[in-house]
Amino acid sequence: GGATFNPIFDEHCQSIGSVEIDPSNPDNIIWVGTGETWTRNSVSVGDGLYKTIDGGSSWNKIAGFEKSERIASVQVNPKNSDEVYVGVLGALFSDSEDRGVYKTLDGGKTWSKILYVDKTTGCSDLYIDPTSPNTVYASFWEFRRSAWNFNSGGNNSALYKSTDGGKTWAKIHKGFPAGKLGRIAFAAAPSNTKILYAVIESEKDTDKGLYRSEDGGANWTKLNGDFELVVRPFYFSRIEIDPRNPDIIVKAGLSGSISRDGGKTFKTLGPMHSDIHDIVFDIKNSDRIYAGTDGGVYRSWDGGTTMEMVENIPVSQFYHISVDNEDPYNVYGGLQDNGSWFGPSSSPGGVEASDWVRVGVGDGYRVLPHPTKKLVYSEMQGAENVWRFDPAKDQAKTIQPLAVKGDPKLRFNWNAPMATSAIKPDRFYFGSQFVHRSEDMGETWVKISPDLTTNDPVKTEQGNSGGLSRDNSGAENHCTIFTIAESPLDENIVWAGTDDGNIQVTKDGGKTWTNVVANVPGLPKNTACWHIEASVFGKGNAYAVFT
């Protein structure tokens, strides 16, 4: 029940889209589809489909899905373990013919693609009716992301049904909103599989919401359009039904919500960390609910009224780490949606959670120790705040650079860059589209560069991002500086790499800058520069990472 966990997949891809336990052999056969399907611009790709027949002791990579990138769903026929369906959502930034629904009749040895829409529309969910396994439902979602924009929805998004094991398919849209559709989350009631629920992203805001069918999808009726149901459908697209009661529905979202009257009204689930992405009922005791959130795994023993955190599973995600020269040295890092921290690399009896010190909130990214003083720099997403933290006093001071009157609005990357100086310890750098420099640990700032990005107006309209559901979190901010490095051998040499493909360098402390990206052989235009490391051996040398 979550009391203990053991890792069984660490040697393989760590980005997971779907886990399916074979209903006929749950102790041994597990399928894993890789690639995260909550399509933020920073999610990792998968490398295909895996299967174990010994409960996770060993895994076989299944041929045919190497280019799938994101597998949204795996479904096993409960009456025939060799019959398996796989829904491939597919590539995030490009066209892909690997999208669609696939089927095997021999346990994964051979596959047939049984439903395909086009290169831009992938399968976002699948369901096999356990009472009639030839009945299969599949939702398809048309979407496309670029580094600076996201578009959810189109004419090809749809919910399909097959009653002959995938030989033929039909859209089941009677009662759906007119016009373009986006992501469709759906589920069937285990106690009565004729009852279906779907949360639909639609062209009109008034049409978005929860729909119900009582005849296997032949007809649909809208029930509810509460904010928590429709918020960020590309990111929160999971709905589950109580296995005993078709009128109890839970929906993932910012806080998670539950209905006990068939979807007419919803209440917030018990307190959890925000951003709930997955929820499941215990099939033997539906009062027990598990939730996967940005803050970890939670469980409920009382049908969602209260939720408790499962604190024995390490699932935090570090964006970036740094270290100091203490003995033992300390490790500094920012966590996805869980703040910024530092802690010792070793401790008598082992490092414990209580040894770690929080130095920031929100999405942390870079956390840097002052080179000579016991101070720590940290930030949150989009440079909404930048801090200088004094651990001895347990005090933090806000120090982020601000736009000067008359200057253009500052564009900060979601993971904005900061850097310290090995030559002048109190010097601190921060990046927007400009390089900002402070000589007094962030008390005052000066710009030492012009706009070092391409400043492409097409790529700086994040207010229009989202498609059918406007989404302007700041994560798509583009034409920004992503990495800064001062030479440890010459304080006048400073490097800056941008997310839109520039490498700029100054040799005179910021008076003049030169874009040297053309000197990188074989680099495609506009390739993001993710990191620059100035050499400790040659003052004109640097190492760069691109993606």
Language-model features: locations:
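Beta-propeller blade termini and top-face loops
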Residues: G1-T547
